């Protein structure tokens, strides 16, 4: 991880750039570095205030005219699967997720590249090298973990180990009040498994087991098709001018 000398957060504002979600809009972000002994505490507070983490930076939209980005968190304790979600959960019952320290591997990067090339070829992350990927995973001063999903082995119920190829990966921050899903990716040719949905369901179960009330999904952008999946996990809360407000869908 990189090291910065300051202990107190200093905030900065980016220059305007094209919005990746809404055509014709310009985005700006306010950001700070998450460093020092209080990085975990600051990350918790900022995430609860609508920030997201990328490497050792916490950021949130600060657009001049648009307020479409809305922070979303699932109420894990009240969540109930829909019929379709139960089907997804059942389809992936042969998978097991194992928690690791935030350390990259060549196997992870190969899966990451397959995912980007298939799903986000023209996106802002499409040219990430293996070094860029390693920095995305390792450059953190907060409580971050990697969850690797593999098929269950014959001794999985005793050892909690999966067997076989790597199928999906989630980069997750563990906070005082929940789990924050920073980034996730999966084998793109297994569309019938709905692995993105499955990993969110798995995080909800993990939050419940740990007694944590929330799963943070980042931003929902009304009008952006790629973000619509986030509001299917109800009940949830949306962050607005009056704080977190309940949303039932």
Curated annotation (Swiss-Prot):
This is Aspartate/glutamate leucyltransferase. GO terms for cellular component: cytoplasm. It catalyses: N-terminal L-glutamyl-[protein] + L-leucyl-tRNA(Leu) = N-terminal L-leucyl-L-glutamyl-[protein] + tRNA(Leu) + H(+); N-terminal L-aspartyl-[protein] + L-leucyl-tRNA(Leu) = N-terminal L-leucyl-L-aspartyl-[protein] + tRNA(Leu) + H(+). The gene is bpt. It is found in: Cytoplasm. HAMAP family: Bpt. One of its GO terms (biological process) is ubiquitin-dependent protein catabolic process via the N-end rule pathway. GO terms for molecular function: arginyl-tRNA--protein transferase activity; leucyl-tRNA--protein transferase activity. Belongs to the R-transferase family. Bpt subfamily. NCBIfam families: PRK01305.1-4, PRK01305.2-3. InterPro entries: Acyl_CoA_acyltransferase, Asp_Glu_LeuTrfase, N-end_Aminoacyl_Trfase, N-end_Aminoacyl_Trfase_C, N-end_Aminoacyl_Trfase_N. The keyword Transferase applies. It comes from Brucella abortus (strain S19). Functions in the N-end rule pathway of protein degradation where it conjugates Leu from its aminoacyl-tRNA to the N-termini of proteins containing an N-terminal aspartate or glutamate. Keywords: Acyltransferase, Cytoplasm, Transferase. It comes from the Bacteria. The keyword Transferase applies. Its EC number is 2.3.2.29. It holds the Pfam family ATE_N.
